[in-house]
Amino acid sequence: MKRSLYTLIQKEDDTVDEVSRLQRNLALIRSCAGWTAAALAEKLGVKRQTISTIEQGENKYRMTRMQYLAIRKVLDDEIAASKDDTQMLYYVIDALVDHPENYTCEERTEILSKAQLLAPSIVKQPNQRKSASNAWKTILAASGVIVSAGLLAVLTRKKE
């Protein structure tokens, strides 16, 4: 029997650490950045197979803390360098990795499903990342999801 995204997220153990959450969502997150596994590997100075192994999940391989830190540095640098076209990436990381406790289960499910819908187009055409990010925000707003923690962070960032 196929389990829904809602069920999977609802049953997520709140004690799961950020390393595990990043590993679980890495394929989607790198797609939101517009990167293939090979592109992320190049940015990290590792082989594509290393990224593929990490993305296979914790049953086959558990990402190390050092790998987590390296991946986060690359992601955070990308967000800082391109704030206008990485909003979707920022919100996905915030909701699924950094602060899932700030979102309801329904909001996380909606964020995940909408990001999965748009992320493949970003990988195919990275120059369309900004328009995909804007479309993602519009879709979330239309579906009634309030990205409260993410919105607060963006508003705070603009004041700085």
State the predicted function of each range:
Residues M1-R3, D98-E160:
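Intrinsically disordered, low-complexity tails and linkers flanking structured cores
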Residues K2-C32:
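A short, Lys/Arg-rich alpha-helix, primarily the initiator
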Residues L26, A37, R48, Y68:
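Helix-turn-helix DNA-binding elements, focusing on the entry/boundary residues of the two helices
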Residues A27, G34-T36, E55-Q56:
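Long, helix-rich, hydrophobic modules that act as membrane-proximal anchors or helical bundle/coiled-coil regulators
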Residues A38-E42:
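Short alpha-helical "recognition helix" segments of helix-turn-helix
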Residues G45-M63:
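Recognition helix of helix-turn-helix/homeodomain-like DNA-binding domains
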Residues M63-K83:
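DNA major-groove recognition helix of helix-turn-helix/homeodomain DNA-binding modules
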